[in-house]
């Protein structure tokens, strides 16, 4: 059925009166109510809102994937102008017709790449499949185009990456593969659902730049779904704010940021962590939390030095971690990934040391090495005066009580078949620290301590929001009264207000229990808020380390300054002219077997402030 008269000549997408409902226990539950939007060629529309606001559900409806989630479009119109200028009503298309439309005319980048990529096919085959299907290219032509797209999204060693599987890549690398796949067929409309949430700030800056460049080249309309208002300020032309399934405010990016009218929009903007907000403060500070009902209500600020002087609780000396890469007829080790190269640091009781850096910098591998989830090539890990890197699994078991972890994805960290009470109680049973009523009381206390109710113990993970699931993971980590918690991107995927709540909870627990945190993150504004000290990692090495105030207010290493410059600022008028976009290639940390990485020496430049002075042939010297 033709619809060309109903769509403006410049519009590529028009949605009117969209209503979406989920089926739950025999009833219809409205998820989206009366949402309307328009998207022009070459325009970027940002849809913002917290979890549960309906923004992702709206995107899935446009892709006609919502039916797979047990939902349906109750009413509304969704018109799309295809690349061949034909206008179609998306809800009228058959499944076979939609398979031809998806990818070629409307494409989507999802937030979680590991669940979007097929684990049994190589990266190259998955990108090439889309190119062959929609462009009619040969296998060789499709692989060549796949390599070119990987180069465009700034993946080093792109030829080698083509033959790797998703699990062999870091989270940031997998997200870049997803972006390359979505853009490979140059769609008329690109829907990006939190595409940069899992990426570090420098890669985020380049991905945003890449999307803008390709958008201009192809006159592509972009719907950018995010909760990061800094990203919105950087990329959006217009903004649609969603709250509880409804569009509560829409306007140009300047109108939304400088003259928001709805209380919820004002709440979103006030909750954004601002880099530089800690200037003049040496100690971590709680986030000022506000509510949509009372936008003027701020929590009080509490500053307290929690660091205990004396001996460090954790010492790392000369840690080296490498991963073998096999190739050839006999599957021999020919190259190695130099993930962590000769790093050393200390962590004191009650202190938060943050590890920051790009994807592939080695920060997560460092955390896993400390937990003995990966084995180190050399170096020493000393916990509470005892060397633990040489202990057997049996002797290490009692020490695991004192070192716990919180991972990025709380849903993947919890057993979906068990109640959350069972998951929280499990460490107590393993270590023989409680059973029966005593363990149940401990679980109830832990749930209350992280802001949940004791009766939540009988629920399953899927019955909670992302922020609630992360609180459950924190409760589980606290079950054994640990001395150190390694938090690996623990808040990066959470909404801004939920992120602030979790950070405040971690600070409260540190103040009450004296816990030391190794906080691994790429979110510089959050790192600035929670840290006592910061260590900046680049290609497996620490290039700058010192008190948080010194590193953030007076960064000495060029790589640290690049990280700072790449942080999005939630102000479109200030931000666009001063934006620093990086174009340097990331050197590869893959080396021939037996090849050594040139060492760097850390030199003292201020009280407790160290910066790397690279050797002339080191990649650091090119920054």
Swiss-Prot record:
GO terms for molecular function: ATP binding; ATP hydrolysis activity. SMART domains: AAA. ATP binds at residues 49-56, 357-364. GO terms for biological process: peptide transport; transmembrane transport. GO terms for cellular component: plasma membrane. Its EC number is 7.4.2.10. It is found in: Cell inner membrane. Residues 15-269, 325-564 form the ABC transporter domain. SUPFAM superfamilies: P-loop containing nucleoside triphosphate hydrolases. It is a peripheral membrane protein. The keyword S-adenosyl-L-methionine does not apply. Part of the ABC transporter complex GsiABCD involved in glutathione import. Responsible for energy coupling to the transport system. The complex is composed of two ATP-binding proteins (GsiA), two transmembrane proteins (GsiC and GsiD) and a solute-binding protein (GsiB). PANTHER family: GLUTATHIONE IMPORT ATP-BINDING PROTEIN GSIA, TRANSPORT ATP-BINDING PROTEIN. Belongs to the ABC transporter superfamily. Glutathione importer (TC 3.A.1.5.11) family. This is Glutathione import ATP-binding protein GsiA.
């Amino acid at each position: 059925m033709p619809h060309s008269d109903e769509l403006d000549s410049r519009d590529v997408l028009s949605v009117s009166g969209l209503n979406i409902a989920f089926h739950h226990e025999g009833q219809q539950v409205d998820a989206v109510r009366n949402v309307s939007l328009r998207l022009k060629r070459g325009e970027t529309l940002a849809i913002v809102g917290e979890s549960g606001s309906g923004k992702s559900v709206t995107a899935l409806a446009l892709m006609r994937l919502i039916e797979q989630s047990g939902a349906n479009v109750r009413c509304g119109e969704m018109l799309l102008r295809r690349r061949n200028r034909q206008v179609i009503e998306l809800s009228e298309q058959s499944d076979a017709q939609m398979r031809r439309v998806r990818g070629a005319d409307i494409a989507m980048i999802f937030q979680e790449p590991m669940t979007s990529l097929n684990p049994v096919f190589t990266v190259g085959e998955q990108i090439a499949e889309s190119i062959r299907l929609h462009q009619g290219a040969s296998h060789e032509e499709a692989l060549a185009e796949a390599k070119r797209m990987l180069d465009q999204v700034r993946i080093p060693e792109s030829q080698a990456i083509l033959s790797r599987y998703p699990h062999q890549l870091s989270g940031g690398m997998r997200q870049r593969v997803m972006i390359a796949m979505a853009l490979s067929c140059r769609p008329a409309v690109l829907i990006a659902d939190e595409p940069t949430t899992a990426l570090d700030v420098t890669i985020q800056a380049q991905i945003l730049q890449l999307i803008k460049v390709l958008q201009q080249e192809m006159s592509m309309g972009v719907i950018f779904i995010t909760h990061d208002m800094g990203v919105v300020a950087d990329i959006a032309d217009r903004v649609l704010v969603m709250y509880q399934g409804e569009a509560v405010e829409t306007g140009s990016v300047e109108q939304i940021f400088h003259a928001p009218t709805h209380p919820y929009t004002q709440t979103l903007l006030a909750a954004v962590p601002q880099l530089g907000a800690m200037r003049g403060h040496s100690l971590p500070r709680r986030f000022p939390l506000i509510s949509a009902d009372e936008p003027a209500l701020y929590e009080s600020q509490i500053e307290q030095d929690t660091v205990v002087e004396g001996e460090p609780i954790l010492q790392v000396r000369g840690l080296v971690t490498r991963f073998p890469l096999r190739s050839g007829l006999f599957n021999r080790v020919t190259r190695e990934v130099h993930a962590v190269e000769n790093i050393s640091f200390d962590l004191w009781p009650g202190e938060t040391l943050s590890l920051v850096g790009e994807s592939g910098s080695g920060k997560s591998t460092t955390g896993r090495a400390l937990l003995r989830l990966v084995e180190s090539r050399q170096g020493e890990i000393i916990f509470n005066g005892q060397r633990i890197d040489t202990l057997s699994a049996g002797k290490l078991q009692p020490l695991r009580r004192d070192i716990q972890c919180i991972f990025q994805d709380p849903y993947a960290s919890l057993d979906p078949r068990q109640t959350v009470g069972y998951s929280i109680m499990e460490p107590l049973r393993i270590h023989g620290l409680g059973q029966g009523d005593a363990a149940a009381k401990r679980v109830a206390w832990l749930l209350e301590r992280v802001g949940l109710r004791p009766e939540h113990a009988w629920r399953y993970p899927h019955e909670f929001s992302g922020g609630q699931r992360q609180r459950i993971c924190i409760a589980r980590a606290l079950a054994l009264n640990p001395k150190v918690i390694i938090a690996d991107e623990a808040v990066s995927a959470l909404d801004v207000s939920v992120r602030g709540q979790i950070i405040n909870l971690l600070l409260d627990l540190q103040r009450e229990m004296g816990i030391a945190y190794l906080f691994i993150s790429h979110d510089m504004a959050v790192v600035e808020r929670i840290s006592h000290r910061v260590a900046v990692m680049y290609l497996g090495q620490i290039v700058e380390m010192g008190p948080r105030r010194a590193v953030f207010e007076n960064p000495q290493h060029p790589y640290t300054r690049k990280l700072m410059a790449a942080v999005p600022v939630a102000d479109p008028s200030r931000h666009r002219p001063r934006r620093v976009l990086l174009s340097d290639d990331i050197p590869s940390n893959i080396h021939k077997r037996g090849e050594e990485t040139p060492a760097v020496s850390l030199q003292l430049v201020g009280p407790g402030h160290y910066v790397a002075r690279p050797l002339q042939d080191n990649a650091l010297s090119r920054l």
